[in-house]
């Protein structure tokens, strides 16, 4: 299966960092393995016309996402981060009862 097949008609495209904290030894290998899977404007153009882009943050611009993708009108990354904050506050409130 190809990236294009996986993205076609998708309503949501999401990604995460290629190298997590603590996995630095795998950095070169992972960058090489994932280099063809960067989410960028061209990739989003292959998806549904109303696609949204999400990322759980933090992100490495130029690796898993292109430099300007956060500024793309299809990006909802900052909304996602804000909503996560409110969800976490609600969980804390519930846990502290």
Predicted region positions:
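Rossmann-like adenosine-cofactor binding region
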Residues: 1-68
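C-terminal helix-to-coil terminal segments
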Residues: 71-97
């Amino acid at each position: 299966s190809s990236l294009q097949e996986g993205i076609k008609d998708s309503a949501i495209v999401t990604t995460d960092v290629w190298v997590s904290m603590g996995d630095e030894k795998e950095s070169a290998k992972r960058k090489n393995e994932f280099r063809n899977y960067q989410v960028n404007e061209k990739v989003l153009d292959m998806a549904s016309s109303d696609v949204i882009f999400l990322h759980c943050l933090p992100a490495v611009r130029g690796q898993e996402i292109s430099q300007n993708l956060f500024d793309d009108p299809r990006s909802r990354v900052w909304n996602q981060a804000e909503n996560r904050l409110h969800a976490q506050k609600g969980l804390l409130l519930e846990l502290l009862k």
